[in-house]
C-alpha cells in the first residue's frame, strides 16, 4: 500500500521497539491508496472532485452538498466528523448496503447488473479491509460516506445508485442496531463464561463456612459458595436484561424509513427486515429514524452489570486484604508498589470499581441527549455511538479480565472459619433454639442479646459458656444447645429454599447452569 506523503506527519516518538513506523496523515487529508491485490487503483478520483483544504490535505466532497455553494469550513468538517467512532460499523454498513441493493434490484428500482456490480464492489472493500490492503480514511465524514465513495470509485455509476430510497438517517439507525446486536451477543457469551467460573468456584467452596455480613458487620454464618452464588444470580439477571434488550432491538428494522417520511420508491421493507434478521420493519418511519431506546436499554443493562461487577470487586478487595484474608489472588492478576516491596494490590478489581462510574456516565449521556430533541433526527443523536460503544468496550474489557482472575482465585477456608468463630454470628440460632423450645421469639431475642453482652464483657464466645451458665439465663437450655450453635450445623440447618446448605448451593449451581443452557 502506498500513501501520498503530502498527507503524512512524522513518526511517533514512542515507537521504541516497533518495526513499523506509523506516519499519520494531517487532519483533513485523504489517503492515496493503491492495492496490492486485484484492483490496480482502489480510488479512481476521476469519479468525483477532490477538495484541498487549508490544513495541507485533500477532502472528499460531502454526500449532502446539494444546495450549498460554499465549501464548508475545515473546522466544521472536523467538528462534524464521526468517522473516528463510527468506523467500527463498517461491516454492518456494508451488509446493510448489500441487502438494500438486493431489494432495489428485486423491486426493479435498479438493474440486476447494478446489483451485481454493487455487491462485487462492496465485497472487494470488505476483503481489502480484512487483508489490510485498504484502510479507512480517517478524514471521511463518516463510515457511510467512506463506503459509498470508495464503492463509487470502484464500480462507477452503480455505486451512485446504491443510496436510492435510503437516507443516512435510516442507514445509521440500521447500522448501530446490527452492531449492537453482535456486541450484545458477545457480551452475553462473556457473562455466561463468568457465571460458569463462579459456579466452579462455588462448587469447590460449598462447605467453607464464613461470616455473612450486614452493614459490614458479622451477621450470620453462610458458606463461601453461597456468597459467590449470589453474584451468579445477579449476573443471570444481567444476562436476561441483555437478551430482552436485544430481542426488542431485533423486533423492528428501520431501513426504508428514509430521512423521516418514507420514500416514493416501491421498497419491500419486509424483505430487507427478514434478510437482516429483524422480525418486521418498524411501523412508523419517524420513530424508525429517531428511536435510540435500544441504545439506552442496552446501556442500562450494561450499567447494571457493571454495578454487580463493582460489588463483587469490592468484596474481593476486602477479602484479599490482611484484615480479612479470605482469599489469595494469583500474582498474575495483581500489581505491586514502586516503593513498598510487600504490596500486592488488587488493581483489576479497583479499576472495575472505578470504570463502573464511566458506564453510568455513558448511560446518563444517552438519557440527557435524547430527553429534549424534537422529532425526527437531530445531529445530537450522533453522540449516541461514543457513549454506547464506550459502555460496550468497558464492560467487555472488565468481563475479559475478571473471569480468569476469579478462576485462579484461591479461597482460604481456615481464615474464613476463624473469622466466623468470632462475632457471635450464631446468636440468631441461639434465639431460634429457645423459640423452638417454646419461648416467644421476642423474649428469646432479648435473652440471647443479654447473653451476648455478658460474653463480650467476659471475652467469651457462646460456645465457651458451660451448660450451667446457659441455664442462668433460661431453664430451656439443654446439652443440645452446643449442636444448635455449631457453625456448620447453623449453615446446614437453614434448609429453606435458596439457603446456604451445601445441598442448596449445589442445587443453585445446577439451576443456574440450566438457565444458561449449559
What residue spans do the PLM features occupy?
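Glycine-rich cofactor/substrate-binding loops
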Residues: 59-96, 157-158, 340-518
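Short, Lys/Arg-enriched N-terminal segments with co-localized hydrophobic residues
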Residues: 40-59
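Amphipathic alpha-helices that form helix-helix packing interfaces
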Residues: 97, 118, 122-125, 187, ...
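Short, charge-rich patches within N-terminal targeting peptides
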Residues: 12-20
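A helix-coil-helix interface module used to build multimeric assemblies
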Residues: 58-248, 252-253, 258, 262, ...
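Methionine residue identity
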Residues: 1-2
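Acidic, glycine-rich loop-and-beta core segments that form the ion-binding/anion-interacting portion
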Residues: 280-364, 368
Amino acid at each position: 500500500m502506498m500513501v501520498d506523503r503530502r498527507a503524512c506527519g512524522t513518526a511517533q516518538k514512542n515507537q521504541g521497539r516497533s518495526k513499523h513506523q506509523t506516519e499519520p496523515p494531517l487532519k483533513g487529508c485523504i489517503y492515496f491508496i493503491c492495492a496490492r491485490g486485484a484492483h490496480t487503483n482502489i480510488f479512481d478520483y476521476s469519479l468525483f472532485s477532490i477538495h484541498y483544504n487549508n490544513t495541507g490535505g485533500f477532502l472528499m466532497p460531502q454526500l449532502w452538498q446539494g444546495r450549498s455553494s460554499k465549501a464548508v469550513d475545515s473546522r466544521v468538517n472536523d467538528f462534524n466528523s464521526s468517522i473516528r467512532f463510527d468506523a467500527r460499523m463498517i461491516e454492518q454498513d456494508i451488509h446493510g448496503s448489500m441487502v438494500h441493493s438486493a431489494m432495489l434490484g428485486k423491486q426493479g428500482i435498479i438493474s440486476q447488473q447494478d446489483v451485481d456490480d454493487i455487491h462485487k464492489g462492496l465485497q472487494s472493500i470488505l476483503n481489502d479491509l480484512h487483508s489490510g490492503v485498504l484502510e479507512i480514511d480517517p478524514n471521511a465524514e463518516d463510515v457511510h460516506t467512506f463506503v459509498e465513495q470508495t464503492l463509487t470509485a470502484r464500480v462507477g455509476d452503480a455505486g451512485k445508485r446504491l443510496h436510492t430510497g435510503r437516507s443516512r438517517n435510516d442507514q445509521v439507525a440500521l447500522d448501530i442496531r446490527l452492531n449492537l446486536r453482535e456486541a450484545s451477543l458477545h457480551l452475553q457469551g462473556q457473562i455466561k463464561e463468568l457465571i460458569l467460573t463462579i459456579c466452579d468456584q462455588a462448587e469447590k467452596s460449598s462447605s467453607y463456612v464464613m461470616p455473612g455480613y450486614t452493614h459490614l458487620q458479622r451477621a450470620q454464618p453462610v458458606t463461601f459458595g453461597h456468597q459467590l452464588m449470589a453474584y451468579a444470580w445477579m449476573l443471570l439477571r444481567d444476562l436476561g436484561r441483555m437478551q430482552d434488550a436485544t430481542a426488542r432491538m431485533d423486533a423492528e428494522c428501520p431501513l426504508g424509513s428514509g430521512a423521516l417520511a418514507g420514500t416514493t420508491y416501491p421498497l419491500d421493507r419486509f424483505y430487507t427486515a427478514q434478510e437482516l434478521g429483524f422480525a418486521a420493519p418498524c411501523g412508523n418511519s419517524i420513530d424508525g429514524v429517531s428511536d435510540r431506546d435500544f441504545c439506552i436499554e442496552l446501556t442500562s443493562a450494561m450499567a447494571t452489570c457493571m454495578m454487580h461487577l463493582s460489588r463483587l470487586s469490592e468484596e474481593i478487595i476486602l477479602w484479599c486484604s490482611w484484615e480479612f484474608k479470605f482469599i489469595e489472588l494469583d500474582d498474575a492478576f495483581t500489581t505491586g508498589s514502586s516503593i513498598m516491596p510487600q504490596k500486592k494490590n488488587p488493581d483489576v478489581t479497583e479499576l472495575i470499581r472505578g470504570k463502573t462510574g464511566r458506564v453510568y456516565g455513558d448511560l446518563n449521556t444517552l438519557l440527557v441527549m435524547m430527553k429534549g430533541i424534537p422529532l425526527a433526527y437531530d445531529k445530537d443523536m450522533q453522540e449516541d455511538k461514543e457513549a454506547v460503544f464506550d459502555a460496550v468496550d468497558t464492560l467487555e474489557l472488565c468481563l475479559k479480565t475478571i473471569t480468569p482472575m476469579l478462576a485462579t482465585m484461591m479461597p482460604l477456608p481456615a481464615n474464613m472459619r476463624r473469622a466466623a468463630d468470632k462475632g457471635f454470628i450464631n446468636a440468631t440460632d441461639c434465639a431460634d433454639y429457645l423459640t423452638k423450645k417454646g419461648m416467644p421469639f421476642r423474649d428469646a431475642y432479648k435473652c440471647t442479646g443479654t447473653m451476648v453482652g455478658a460474653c463480650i464483657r467476659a471475652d467469651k464466645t457462646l460456645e465457651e459458656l458451660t451448660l450451667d451458665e446457659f441455664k442462668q439465663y433460661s431453664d430451656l437450655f439443654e446439652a443440645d444447645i452446643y449442636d444448635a450453635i455449631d457453625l456448620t450445623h447453623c449453615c446446614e440447618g437453614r434448609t429453606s429454599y435458596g439457603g446456604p446448605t451445601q445441598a442448596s448451593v449445589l442445587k443453585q449451581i445446577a439451576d443456574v447452569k440450566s438457565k444458561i443452557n449449559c
